[in-house]
């Protein structure tokens, strides 16, 4: 079958699945997208903030430049970041290349585009149960609970079914050598949303703020709606409150106090009603995924979180997935007889580098070790300051989100960081452990007593 006209099955209708479906439909291919949910309820209120950097923007532009116009109407340009530790401003990062929005909004504008595309069919209520690699069949569970099987032998299958990908799980044991690493985040993120036009002394809506002590993050959307994201780390004393689902007076008061202590600059943004609404919102978790390869011959390929789940502090979740969609489409349209293998060979060095970066950040985010968390703050400050400290390899954030950010391959950006991290971070961690150990000894030492005169 001609690879340029071969039908395509896409699993998953998130931003990555719809992105690749729309790109492939441009060439007249018949594309069918299978989605587990009966209906996609896409609202900012039950989503989370993301920044769309030049990687994600380029994919949206290639699909339709009007999508970028929608993004700019709804979002806010991020002029930069401010990083706080212990209530003190410790680092600044300039940007001007990233647009602030929510994952739900990006998904929404892509879905609206997909629903109007005559070459694209969206099939809802089909949750992938398993993949039969030998028979080239896909087995779905319908909303009714019944199973149905789709013969996909004559199609190319693109699995964009997310971090908990049923496709990826199915390949284990069926595909020799396929043994992905799955590292659960160990945290859940949940978001407070302000009323439109909210303001607070010391906060600039063109800036995003990171409060390192408790892993809090604030960002703005259109109409100066502020998002204040909190991090519930498994096993910590804050976790029950941050995951509570009842807006009791006690919970609301405790959450208000938590925000005042952890991110005091954001407290004036939020009303009591904003705190009440928080307890009715979803929380989000995930995992860092590292696969040894992402294709099964020329029949199936994994992209997005199914292939390389990251963690929000990377800023690359949706962006890297949208870039997958664009690069995979270029290989499929190249005329090569082996586009999936070509994509795998070209993309894996970048995914390996991104995976190592994400794994490191995951271990820091979920750590309850104060020494590691202190070392991480120091390492992150060094990464932002970079040049003045002679740590050019630490400037990952600047190259991903700074004023000159572009689509430089991840391997080129992250290789120097990986080399330096392997040398420097263990030293920082050891020094922090020693410092905390000394502090504990001093606290235990009995006070000196004086002999009576």
Regions found by a protein language model. Give the residues of each.
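Conserved FAD-binding catalytic core of PHBH/FMO-like flavoproteins
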Residues: 112, 117, 126-130, 135-283, ...
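C-terminal helical "tail/cap" subdomain of flavin- and related membrane-associated enzymes
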Residues: 4-5, 268-269, 330-453
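Conserved N-terminal helical subregion
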Residues: 2-8, 25, 53-191, 406-413, ...
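Acidic/histidine metal-binding catalytic segments
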Residues: 70-74, 121, 260-279, 336-344, ...
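Conserved N-terminal glycine-rich FAD pyrophosphate-binding loop of Rossmann-like flavoproteins
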Residues: 38-59
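Conserved mid-domain beta->alpha element of the FAD-binding
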Residues: 10-26, 37, 158-159, 192, ...
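Glycine-rich FAD pyrophosphate-binding loop
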Residues: 25-45
